[in-house]
């Protein structure tokens, strides 16, 4: 078989969990490579992609977020930083539908193939609807299926794009057959992008921590996101692993046109890879600007270092 017919020695035609099916059909089905879309939101670079407007979130008498507002611009890496307990993960949970704020809006902008604009308030939608709109996220604590292989975990990330039912998929019939091949091609491209080829058939639970974090990034990419939400993607990594992860995030952003909103505690990484930084402290926004502007913000310095 040629490179177009195989991926690392295995036929591409597989089911959603990677088990080989009907390899004799692969040459006929693979007519072109699936390409990771550039700027799937179709929002022009430099225009607002996500607007957080006066978002407030409370748990009983505890205020996690208080009237937080900022804008994530298409084509940017936007960092959200702050001390522990500042409300950063709560904000990502609101944007991904896990929490519903008591007040405010989280507006996602997009355009269709004809250029017609649409806006969705993520604060009112459930997680599966948000995923279908092109918002994907990773978690601070690894949330992978440890008993499945790397390939199988990434294939599960394609579920939001699957259009055929269980029976056609089981018998590998008609359009379901073509769809399955396309999903596998997409996953293989993500594996290439993140340089995970050597681990593709390994069970995720057996992989090193840094590789597992990369797999989680890959699964989020398999959603085909316009906006990628990353919750401390470098937590627990050593310096070399952080450098690698920063490079992969920049590759996703620069080569694939995916906008990124990330939470990260390593200020060196934040200042190096971010276009814009928003700072939270006790649920309130105390700074928003370029890395240089935030670095010079006295309120930010005080929140991190304390007042004299």
Residue ranges of model-derived segments:
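Cationic, low-complexity basic patches in intrinsically disordered or flexible, solvent-exposed regions
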Residues: 11
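Glycine-rich phosphate-binding loops of nucleotide-dependent enzymes
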Residues: 18, 23, 27-308
């Amino acid at each position: 078989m040629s490179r177009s017919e195989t991926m690392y020695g295995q036929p591409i035609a597989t089911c959603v969990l990677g088990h080989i099916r009907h390899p004799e059909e692969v040459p006929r089905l693979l007519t072109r490579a699936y390409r990771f879309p550039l700027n799937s939101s179709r929002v022009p670079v430099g225009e607002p992609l996500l607007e957080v407007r006066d978002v407030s979130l409370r748990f009983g008498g505890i205020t996690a977020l208080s009237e937080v507002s900022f804008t994530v611009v298409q084509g940017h890496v936007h960092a959200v930083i702050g001390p522990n307990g500042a409300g950063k993960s709560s904000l990502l949970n609101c944007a991904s539908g896990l929490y519903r704020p008591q007040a405010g809006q989280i507006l996602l902008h997009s355009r269709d193939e004809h250029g017609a604009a649409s806006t969705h308030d993520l604060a009112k939608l459930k997680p599966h609807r948000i995923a279908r709109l092109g918002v994907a996220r990773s978690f601070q604590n690894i949330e992978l299926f440890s008993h499945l292989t790397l390939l199988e975990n990434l294939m599960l990330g394609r579920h939001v794009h699957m259009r055929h039912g269980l029976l056609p998929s089981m018998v590998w019939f008609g359009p379901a057959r073509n769809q399955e091949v396309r999903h596998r091609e997409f996953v293989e491209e993500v594996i290439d992008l993140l340089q995970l080829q050597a681990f593709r058939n390994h069970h995720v639970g057996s992989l090193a921590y840094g590789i597992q974090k990369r797999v989680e990034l890959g699964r989020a990419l398999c959603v085909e996101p316009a906006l990628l939400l990353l919750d401390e993607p470098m937590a627990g990594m050593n310096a070399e692993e952080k450098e690698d992860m920063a490079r992969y995030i920049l590759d996703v952003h620069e080569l694939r046109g995916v906008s990124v909103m990330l939470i990260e505690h390593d200020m060196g990484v934040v200042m190096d890879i971010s276009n814009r930084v928003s700072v939270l402290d006790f649920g309130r926004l105390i700074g928003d600007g370029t890395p240089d502007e935030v670095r010079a913000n006295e309120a930010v310095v005080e929140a991190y270092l304390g007042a004299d």
